[in-house]
Amino acid sequence: MGRKWNNIKDKKASKDANTSRIYAKFGREIYVAAKQGEPDPESNQALRVVLERAKTYNVPRTIIDRAVEKAKGGSEENYDELRYEGFGPNGAMVIVDTLTNNVNRTAADVRAAFSKNSGNMGVNGSVAYMFDATAVIGLEGKTSDEVLEILMEADVDARDILEEEDAVIVYAEPDQFHAVQSALKDAGVEEFTVAELTMLAQNDVTLPEDAQAQFEKMVDALEDLEDVQQVYHNVDLGE
């Protein structure tokens, strides 16, 4: 399965503390999902996924409503969903997902973030085959056995169910995201600590200390780009 979710979460915590950055990225993602389909999450699964994710980051209702209303209002602002793949120091593998209204700008910015930090862009497919698209659902107040029983009774498949720190984390196929959540909600779960569609590395690598410092600098540079929504990688950043 690669890194446990909490290992990823802990390293993201300091970056995610930048709430204005997080809210801006969610605002854009909600707008795009609402514009591409119905602005109603009941009939728009992509929008429902984004809104469930937003809940776990405590995105204010005002941010959500503003993005949905913008989509309803027929805004002509369009974004392309683009994925870039590349390598960091010591051949570390990186995937960068973006939403952009200026492809040339985004490509140049992403390329610069790689090249200025001992990395380089790769071609499409150069690293993605080493990652698995995964739904990650986290909750508290249940044991892994209880969650397994709930999902089995609801006839919902999961790849893995692990107890990580004080939470239970369910790893499933992306198309099982809503099914997992629905089964748990029906069983009385009201809040989720994690609700993500992510790319998990099949195998992790450990970098020498100097290379890891350079790698973390590169990831920070990528995540700070306005058009970047998510950065995935295969580096075990340790404690």
Curated annotation (Swiss-Prot):
GO terms for cellular component: cytosol. GO terms for biological process: regulation of DNA-templated transcription. It holds the Pfam family Transcrip_reg. Coiled coil: none annotated. InterPro entries: Integrase-like_N (IPR017856), TACO1_YebC-like_2nd/3rd_dom (IPR048300), TACO1_YebC_N (IPR049083), Transcrip_reg_TACO1-like (IPR002876), Transcrip_reg_TACO1-like_dom3 (IPR026564), Transcrip_reg_TACO1_YeeN (IPR026562), YebC-like (IPR029072). It is found in: Cytoplasm. One of its GO terms (molecular function) is DNA binding. Keywords: Cytoplasm, DNA-binding, Transcription, Transcription regulation. Belongs to the TACO1 family. YeeN subfamily. This is Probable transcriptional regulatory protein BA_0541/GBAA_0541/BAS0510.
